[in-house]
């Protein structure tokens, strides 16, 4: 039973310290809507909740539900290419076993995620299917264990339907960097889904699965969520175990999740979050039941966000951000004001320094982490006459261009002659970024910004211009540097494609305050009466 509204308000801390670097936000913009589709718009509904209710009532079987999703996956996968590996036969067997247990009256059969089909980004280990990291060097690799996040989903009753595509080892923003295939965007198959978790975002957007897992090192959950019109959550660093996640940059990597609604995303977080003895960086803080704290639309008052203070980051609405994106974000801010919150502009002076610092730090950590891929212990091995040649051949043939480039960049930054000039200075910038966010979040309950400078762009548009691609991460990397939680919810559209292109609103909170973000995101989502984030691909099929 959701808590009453007053309890909901009390769950959000309100700090009102004076700030010289703020001004009242004003916006006349309305939320940007997309051209009409054949599916009726309305508040996002929970697929997880409806699946659970239908199983408990006997209205549907797990086999029926699985068949529905697999049918849609088979229909759309040739054009989307969201999955590197599909475990359809295994999913059908698990669904049949669940039905058998329900029929036999086993009380624990219908777990919180019973019958829910989940896609898993292919840099998370799965013992019963290949785990490649999107790289040729791990082609055919089958781990001996499941990642903790995957195991917890399965223990809650979820059915893993397959491994989703990604930029190789998470290094990219378009999913064009995969060694196996290019994933497309369900809103327009000539456009990228974002990255590096593009396969996970595309799969949820196209309803190939109910929810999915991704990873976020510098925006790899949030930017694809914005591009594909789904909800994406990057938890606080340490909130979810990284055990079984192929390491890219260990001080930045976070396991995140995607859903078609905030409720679904909150439900997944409640399952996967929590301390894990296999990950020394995982937090021992108590994990709330995030979904139970969400208030349904019919229980909301006219001003459900009254008393909430929101800061809109000035630096995210300037040069380099598309006008249509700015209009959508301003429209979303105006909507939040109509719900009762106070929205003011706030400046984060160190914001622009985050991007170069991030790429130095991430590449430096990657140069160490990826040294484990040597062609000996696991993965693909290339023939050679001696050990050094084996290392060279395996890495030269097994790793892609972007990965090699970042390894070289990181090795350079860590070298004796340049450590102080690059790596040490980047760490100092990271401290400034953390302090900047800390100061802002002492004055505001939540900060907001766009999740990406533009909507989804054409496949091939930026793949040969790495600087332009890196610049696209400027709105997300600071959150990783600071280790903060952030939620992306669809908030509007810009022109493009057959039915417009979605834009995501990024909500940023204090450490371990995911509950605040989810409550505000849920209220925002539920009150968008005239927007539907169902891609035309589904309306046609």
From Swiss-Prot:
Which reaction is recorded as catalysed by this protein?
L-glutamyl-tRNA(Gln) + L-glutamine + ATP + H2O = L-glutaminyl-tRNA(Gln) + L-glutamate + ADP + phosphate + H(+)
Alphabetized InterPro entries for the sequence? Amidase (IPR000120), Amidase_CS (IPR020556), Amidase_dom (IPR023631), AS_sf (IPR036928), GatA (IPR004412)
User: What GO cellular-component annotations does this UniProt entry give?
Assistant: chloroplast stroma; glutamyl-tRNA(Gln) amidotransferase complex; mitochondrion
The keyword Coiled coil appears for this protein? no
Q: What does the UniProt keyword field contain? A: ATP-binding, Chloroplast, Ligase, Mitochondrion, Nucleotide-binding, Plastid, Protein biosynthesis
Q: Recite the other comments.
A: This protein may be expected to contain an N-terminal transit peptide but none has been predicted.
Tell me what this protein is called.
Answer: Glutamyl-tRNA(Gln) amidotransferase subunit A, chloroplastic/mitochondrial
What species is given as this protein's source? Answer: Sorghum bicolor
Q: Which gene encodes it?
A: GATA
